[in-house]
Curated annotation (Swiss-Prot):
Chain coiled-coil ranges: 242-262, 300-367
Biased composition (Basic and acidic residues): 211-232
InterPro entries according to UniProt: NUP58/p45/49
Assembly and binders: Component of the p62 complex, a complex composed of NUP62, NUP54, and isoform p58 and isoform p45 of NUP58. Isoform p58 interacts with NUTF2. Isoform p58 interacts with SRP1-alpha and Importin p97 proteins when they are together, but not with SRP1-alpha protein alone.
UniProt lineage: Eukaryota, Metazoa, Chordata, Craniata, Vertebrata
Gene this protein is translated from: Nup58
Swiss-Prot/TrEMBL domain comment: Contains FG repeats. FG repeats are interaction sites for karyopherins (importins, exportins) and form probably an affinity gradient, guiding the transport proteins unidirectionally with their cargo through the NPC. FG repeat regions are highly flexible and lack ordered secondary structure. The overall conservation of FG repeats regarding exact sequence, spacing, and repeat unit length is limited.
Source species: Rattus norvegicus
Name of the protein in its database record: Nucleoporin p58/p45
Keywords: Coiled coil, Glycoprotein, Membrane, mRNA transport, Nuclear pore complex, Nucleus, Phosphoprotein, Protein transport, Repeat, Translocation, Transport
Any one GO biological process: mRNA transport
Length: 585
C-alpha cells in the first residue's frame, strides 16, 4: 500500500507481490504494483477497485510509468498492464483521466470502463460514456459508441469531439455542431438528448421507414404480394370485361336452348326441302313449256296476221292480175301440210285407243314373258341411243380439232379456248350434289378439340405431391446429374427455370436434393432432354415454380411427345444435335 508521494522501491523488472495479491511499494513508484488509495489522482482510467493479483515484468526505463497497475494515489497516467478492467471504480475529488490503455493497436484505444464521479470532473477523453455524473463536467470528449450517454445533472460543457469530415471519436450524441461541441453546450439540470442518426438517400427518402413500407417482391410476406393482384382495373377495361361476360352468358343460354332441341325437326325440314325441290322442278318444267307455247303462239299469230293481210290484198286485186299473185297458193300448200301432220297424229291416237279397247274386251293379263320382252326392247333402245351418242361425240371431237387448227392457222391463237369450259365443268362435276351438311349433334368427337382440352386440364390440375423420378439432366455447364430427384408434377413434366433441371423422364428440380452434380437452386436457362419429354425442348426463360406453359420458351414446344431430344414419334430415338456435346463449353 502506497501512501503519499512514493518514488517506489521495486526492483527493475520485478514486483513484490503480497500474499493478498497487492504489491507493496512506497513513494513515487516506477514499476511497482500499488493498492487502491484515496486522494488526489490524475487519471485512473484503467484502475480497478479490486485489482487482480498480477505481476508485471518490464525491461528498460519507464517500467513503472507504462507497465504497472494504476494506483489511486498521486499517479501520472497509470495504465493497466493486461486486459482492460471492466468494473467501475468510485473516485472522489478532482480527477483528470488521461490514461492510455494497453493492448491496443491504435493510438486512441477505447476501453469499456465507466466512472462515477462527483464534484468537478473533466471526464476522460478515452473512456466510455460516463454514467450519472453530477457537477461540472466536460462531457464525453471522444466517447466510444459502446453505450449511450446517461443523464448528466448540473452544468455540463462539451460534447462529442468529432474530426473534420469524419468522426475520429464516435459518440452516442449525434446532434453536434462545430468541432464536436454539443449544440446545447450549456444545459442546466436537463438530460442530454440522444437521437439515432437518420440515413437518407437521394431525394430525401428515409430508408429506415420506407423499407418497411416497400412491397416485398420475394414473396416472404403474402399480404404484400397479394396487394398487386387486387389492384383495381381502369373503368374502361372493367366495362369491356362486363360486356364480355354478358356476351358469354347470352351465348351459353343459346347453347342450352339449342342442346334441348330435337333433331327430328331438322330431319323434317330436310324432307320438306326435298319435296319443295321436286315441286320446283315441276313448276320450272311447266314454266318452260308454257314459254315455248307462248313463243309458238306469237309466231302463229304473226303468221295469221300476215295471211289476213294477204287475203285482203288478194280480194282487192282485179281478176286479170291474179296470175301474178302466188301468195294464196303458198298459204293453201302450208295449210295442207299442217292438215297432213295433224291427220297422222290423229291416226296414231285412234290406233292406241283401239288397242286399249281390244285389251279391255279380251281381258288378257300381262305375262312375265311380256315384261321380259318389254325390258329387252327398252335395253335395245338404250343401246341404239348410246351408239348414236358415241357417233355424235366423235363428230364433235373432229369438229373441235378442226376449229382449233383453224384458229391456229388463220388467227395465230395456239391456246385452247375450251379449257375454261372444261375446268368449269370439272368443278361442277366435283361439286357435291347434295348440299346437306353434317349433323351438329355428332357422336364422333373432334380429335384436335379433345387434345387441346386434355392439355389445358393437365396444365391446370394441381400437383398431387412429389413423386420420385429417374433421368438425365443437362445443365447450363452441361454437367450431368444421374440420380433420383423430386419432381413436382409426375412423370413427363417439369418445373421451368431450374438450373440443371430437365423436362424429361425425371430429373432434379429446383430446391430438391439430387444425387449428382450440375443441379443447383440457381434459376437460369436450361437445355433439357430426356425420355418422355412433354414440356419444352430448348432454352427456357421463365420463373421457377410456375407451370410449364406459362414461361417464355425459346425453342420448340413438343406437347405429349416421347422421343429423345426435341421429341418425335412414339418410342423413336433420334440423334442429338451436333452442338450439344458433353465436353463443349
Amino acid at each position: 500500500m502506497a501512501t503519499g508521494f512514493s518514488f517506489g522501491s521495486g526492483t527493475l523488472g520485478s514486483t513484490t507481490v503480497a500474499p493478498g495479491g497487492t504489491g507493496t511499494g512506497s513513494g513515487f513508484s516506477f514499476g511497482a504494483s500499488s493498492t487502491p488509495s484515496v486522494g488526489l489522482n490524475f487519471g485512473t482510467l484503467g484502475s480497478s477497485a479490486t485489482p487482480a493479483s498480477t505481476s508485471t515484468s518490464a525491461s528498460g526505463f519507464g517500467t513503472g510509468l507504462f507497465g504497472s497497475k494504476p494506483g489511486t494515489g498521486f499517479t501520472l497516467g497509470g495504465t493497466s498492464a493486461g486486459t482492460t478492467a471492466t468494473t467501475s471504480a468510485s473516485t472522489t475529488g478532482f480527477s483528470l483521466g488521461f490514461s492510455k490503455p494497453a493492448a491496443s493497436a491504435t493510438p486512441f484505444a477505447l476501453p469499456v470502463t465507466s466512472t462515477t464521479a462527483s464534484g468537478l470532473t473533466l471526464s476522460s477523453a478515452l473512456t466510455s460514456a460516463p454514467a450519472a455524473s453530477t457537477g461540472f463536467t466536460l462531457n464525453n470528449l471522444g466517447a466510444t459508441p459502446a453505450t449511450t450517454t446517461a443523464a448528466s445533472t448540473g452544468l455540463s460543457l462539451g460534447g462529442a469531439l468529432a474530426g473534420l469530415g469524419g468522426s475520429l471519436f464516435q459518440s452516442g450524441n449525434t446532434a453536434t455542431s462545430g468541432l464536436g461541441q454539443n449544440a446545447l453546450s450549456l444545459s442546466l439540470g436537463t438530460a442530454t438528448p440522444t437521437s439515432a442518426a437518420s440515413s437518407e438517400g437521394l431525394g430525401g427518402i428515409d430508408f429506415s421507414t420506407s423499407s418497411d413500407k416497400k412491397s416485398d417482391k420475394t414473396g416472404t410476406r403474402p399480404e404484400d404480394s397479394k396487394a398487386l393482384k387486387d389492384e383495381n382495373l381502369p373503368p374502361v377495361i372493367c366495362q369491356d370485361v362486363e360486356n364480355l361476360q354478358k356476351f358469354v352468358k347470352e351465348q351459353k343460354q343459346v347453347q342450352e336452348e339449342i342442346s334441348r332441341m330435337s333433331s327430328k325437326a331438322m330431319l323434317k325440314v330436310q324432307e320438306d326441302i326435298k319435296a319443295l325441290k321436286q315441286l320446283l322442278s315441276l313448276a320450272a318444267s311447266g314454266l318452260q313449256r308454257n314459254t315455248l307455247n307462248i313463243d309458238k303462239l306469237k309466231l302463229e299469230t304473226a303468221q295469221e296476221l300476215k295471211n289476213a293481210e294477204i287475203a285482203l290484198r288478194t280480194q282487192k286485186t282485179p281478176p286479170g292480175l291474179q296470175h301474178e299473185n302466188t301468195a294464196p297458193a303458198d298459204y293453201f300448200r302450208v295449210l295442207v301440210q299442217q292438215f297432213e301432220v295433224q291427220l297422222q297424229q290423229y291416226r296414231q291416237q285412234i290406233e292406241e285407243l283401239e288397242n286399249h279397247l281390244a285389251t279391255q274386251a279380251n281381258n288378257s293379263h300381262i305375262t312375265p314373258q311380256d315384261l321380259s320382252m318389254a325390258m329387252q326392247k327398252i335395253y335395245q333402245t338404250f343401246v341404239a341411243l348410246a351408239a348414236q351418242l358415241q357417233s355424235i361425240h366423235e363428230n364433235v371431237k373432229v369438229l373441235k380439232e378442226q376449229y382449233l387448227s383453224y384458229r391456229k392457222m388463220f388467227l395465230g391463237d395456239a391456246g385452247d379456248v375450251f379449257e375454261a369450259r372444261r375446268t368449269e365443268a370439272k368443278k361442277w362435276q366435283n361439286a357435291p350434289r347434295v348440299t346437306t351438311g353434317p349433323t351438329p349433334f355428332s357422336t364422333m368427337p373432334n380429335a384436335a378439340a379433345v387434345a387441346m382440352a386434355a392439355t389445358l386440364t393437365q396444365q391446370q390440375q394441381p400437383a398431387t405431391g412429389p413423386q420420385p423420378s429417374l433421368g438425365v439432366s443437362f445443365g447450363t455447364p452441361f454437367g450431368s446429374g444421374i440420380g433420383t430427384g423430386l419432381q413436382s408434377s409426375g412423370l413427363g413434366s417439369s418445373n421451368l427455370g431450374g438450373f440443371g433441371t430437365s423436362s424429361g423422364f425425371g430429373c432434379g428440380t429446383t430446391g430438391a436434393s439430387t444425387f449428382g452434380f450440375g443441379t443447383t437452386d440457381k434459376p437460369s436457362g436450361s437445355l433439357s432432354a430426356g425420355f418422355g419429354s412433354s414440356s419444352t425442348s430448348g432454352f427456357n426463360f421463365s420463373n421457377p415454380g410456375i407451370t410449364a406453359s406459362a414461361g417464355l420458351t425459346f425453342g420448340v414446344s413438343n406437347p405429349a411427345s416421347a422421343g429423345f431430344g426435341t421429341g418425335g414419334q412414339l418410342l423413336q430415338l433420334k440423334r442429338p444435335p451436333a452442338g450439344n456435346k458433353r465436353g463443349k463449353r
